[in-house]
Amino acid sequence: MSWQAYVDDHLMCDIEGHEDHRLTAAAIVGHDGSVWAQSATFPQFKPVEMNGIMTDFNEPGHLAPTGLHLGGTKYMVIQGEAGAVIRGKKGSGGITIKKTGQALVFGIYEEPVTPGQCNMVVERLGDYLIEQGL
């Protein structure tokens, strides 16, 4: 399966039991900041933004004082899982980022999608990639 198919079929899909509820944007990005695949709506990010995200995975709490920035949008960092998941909130939406051995899985959402639904979609794919050694 291509990386784009993972984004299209496993991240940008209808959320179980909620037809027409789906993430607004998603991507799989290498630890080096290279985009493996992304939705058409995923924001163009700056290398410094990706560096900040990677630093927070290695030094949990790094982004808490300044917020998480992606594509110029600032998210307030909320409780995640140290070294594994970063979660952010902005207004009625937010972001979930799951770290795997080689990549970061991103999901961005707006209402009516809930934070829990975004977490489920992103973390399920991230866990699968980890099981595959990726």
From Swiss-Prot:
Keyword Disulfide bond included in the entry's annotation: yes
UniProt motif (Involved in PIP2 interaction) ranges: 84-100
Broad class of the protein's primary localization: cytoplasm
Organism: Olea europaea
Transmembrane feature ranges: none
Biological role: Binds to actin and affects the structure of the cytoskeleton. At high concentrations, profilin prevents the polymerization of actin, whereas it enhances it at low concentrations.
Record-linked InterPro entries: PFN (IPR048278), PFN_euk (IPR005455), PFN_sf (IPR036140), Profilin_CS (IPR027310)
Biological classification of the source: Eukaryota, Viridiplantae, Streptophyta, Embryophyta, Tracheophyta
Modified how: Phosphorylated by MAP kinases.
Record keywords: Actin-binding, Allergen, Cytoplasm, Cytoskeleton, Disulfide bond, Phosphoprotein
Subunit and partners: Occurs in many kinds of cells as a complex with monomeric actin in a 1:1 ratio.
Subcellular location field: Cytoplasm, Cytoskeleton
Domain of life: Eukaryota
An MF annotation (GO) of this entry: actin monomer binding
GO-annotated cellular components: cell cortex; cytoskeleton
Protein name: Profilin-4
Extra information: The variability of the residues taking part of IgE-binding epitopes might be responsible of the difference in cross-reactivity among olive pollen cultivars, and between distantly related pollen species, leading to a variable range of allergy reactions among atopic patients.
Residue(s) carrying Phosphothreonine: T114
Family: Belongs to the profilin family.
Any Pfam family the entry gives: Profilin
